[in-house]
Amino acid sequence: FDHNIPANTIGSAEFQKVCRDFIQTQNITKNFIHGEGICHQVVPEMGLVEPGKVIVGADSHTCTYGAFGAFSTGMGATDLAMVWATGKTWFMVPEAIKMEVTGELNPYIAPKDIILNIIGEIGIAGATYKTAEFCGPAIESMGVEGRATMCNMAIEMGAKNGIMEPNKEVIDYICQRTGKKESELNIVKSDEDAVYSKEMHFDITDMEPHIAYPND
């Protein structure tokens, strides 16, 4: 309920009570009702994200977890209910767009500026149902927070998911929170001869700060 705490309507409050009752009757231990933080941060912090996993959630920004090398995407409530009930779901395998980012961040530029620049170029529907694969020297040197920021915004260009190959900082982060060794992780990498539906290149050397504003 992290996006709606405290409940702002009677309907929301009643819905949350139904969920809490369900959690208790099903003895679900991994639940974060309130006071924990936003799920996009809490889920990886609690060690619930690993590379190579398929993760779905009832929020469009579930794609955040691609920063950790997972295929992660949001879906509707009905689809997610079926995942809960059956443990299965159906996907059309998305084509991939390679987004290579080169150059170095200057003191006035953050990963949010980079992703806003990318979205501005490709458009809000330019990557619809595609995988946005972020790579390049600028991505390789980027920390956990910056990577999460970029993958979080993949949906804003229509992408099915955003994903990055985990670097050492990400791997160490995951190992610390899951208690696993690097050798136990299923780190997925693109083949050197991988074929993409489109390739885009962004040099951030001279990039300026960006501000997003409503399109209407």
Summary of predicted features, one role per range:
Residues 1-216:
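Fe-S-dependent hydro-lyases/dehydratases of central metabolism
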